């Protein structure tokens, strides 16, 4: 377990420091005294529902994760599967969420699952999440006429990657190109296994299932903003809330910053101001949203990582 901790310690701590800096920046932009005043008027009746919605997102994402494992003929023990998936949430503050490849390492330790297969699952999770967020954001774009350039580009890039993964010819051409050089042959062999696994995950039925799950799960996060604004005494439409969280998440993902930190918060804040909220309420809503949809998941993930350590590495302990 020390090997895992050492590998991901720096990016995790880096993400944590950036996160704290972003919180300070949002408080300053929103006027600290004004934000505190808005928080003082928070209707606590909404809090349990807000805190429940983000974990519901994780439940749906776990369903997709388990579905992909089944398609890949990987069958971890149910309890360990839950802990391994949960552990990945602790790494959402690493750049581009690449820390979620931790799940691949843990599956390797648990059932000796090939990294080429499990990494394709993590990639498929991210791509289908991206498609789901783009669909949700598109609904808002149709209603508000905002983000017309970003979304077609997002669909285009994601679609191109999925189409590329349907064909092994480019990868086999690469294999012939590198010849008998040992290192590069290993790399191309990995890519061919990765592509073969990914192709199973992107059949039309699998793609539709994963995207529908993604739309549902990210819709819950949109409801967080809707309820947070309500709790602060403001008004925003549910469609507007879904647009804010999905569009800001896309921008955060495209930034490749840890957890989209800074970009996601700035986008949420700007879009809430654009939707007509006051500066203080927009800042307070941004903080509640990011705590519920990001940092709560990180805390849950750290608990999962601790429990995985106890289960997988009893001998080391």
Ranges and model annotations:
Residues 1-86, 143-253, 286, 291-317:
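Predominantly cytoplasmic-facing regulatory/coupling regions of multi-pass membrane proteins
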Residues 61, 99, 131-139, 155-157:
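Membrane-embedded alpha-helical core segments of multi-pass
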Residues 82-112:
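Extended non-transmembrane interhelical loops and adjacent amphipathic helices
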Residues 87-96, 245-265:
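Transmembrane alpha-helix interface/packing and boundary motifs in multi-pass membrane proteins
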Residues 107-115, 244, 248, 266-284:
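Interfacial segments of multi-pass membrane proteins
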């Amino acid at each position: 377990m020390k090997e895992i901790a050492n590998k991901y310690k720096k990016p995790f701590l880096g993400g944590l420091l950036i996160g704290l800096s972003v919180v300070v920046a949002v408080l300053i932009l929103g006027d600290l005294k004004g934000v505190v005043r808005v928080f003082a008027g928070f209707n606590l009746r909404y809090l349990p529902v807000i805190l429940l919605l983000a974990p519901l997102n994780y439940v749906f994402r776990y369903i997709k994760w388990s579905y992909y494992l089944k398609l890949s003929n990987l069958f971890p023990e149910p309890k360990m599967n839950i802990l391994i998936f949960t552990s990945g949430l602790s790494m959402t503050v690493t750049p581009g969420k690449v820390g979620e490849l931790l799940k691949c390492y843990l599956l390797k330790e648990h059932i000796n699952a090939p990294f080429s297969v499990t990494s394709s699952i993590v990639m498929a999770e991210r791509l289908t999440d991206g498609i789901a967020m783009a669909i949700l954001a598109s609904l808002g774009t149709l209603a508000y006429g905002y983000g017309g350039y970003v979304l077609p580009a997002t669909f285009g890039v994601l679609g191109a990657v999925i189409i590329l993964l349907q064909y092994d010819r480019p990868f086999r051409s690469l294999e012939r190109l590198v010849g008998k050089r040992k290192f590069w042959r290993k790399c191309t062999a990995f890519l061919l296994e990765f592509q073969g696994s990914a192709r199973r995950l992107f059949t039309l039925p699998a793609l539709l299932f994963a995207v529908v799950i993604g739309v549902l799960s990210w819709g819950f996060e949109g409801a967080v903003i809707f309820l947070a604004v309500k709790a602060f005494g403001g008004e925003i439409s549910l469609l507007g809330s879904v647009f804010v969280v999905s569009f800001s998440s896309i921008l955060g993902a495209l930034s490749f910053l840890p957890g989209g930190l800074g970009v996601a918060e700035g986008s949420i804040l700007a879009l809430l101001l654009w939707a007509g909220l006051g500066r203080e309420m927009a800042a307070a809503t941004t903080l509640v949203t990011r705590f519920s949809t990001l940092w709560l998941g990180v805390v849950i993930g750290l608990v999962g990582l601790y429990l995985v350590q106890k289960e997988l590495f009893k001998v080391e302990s």
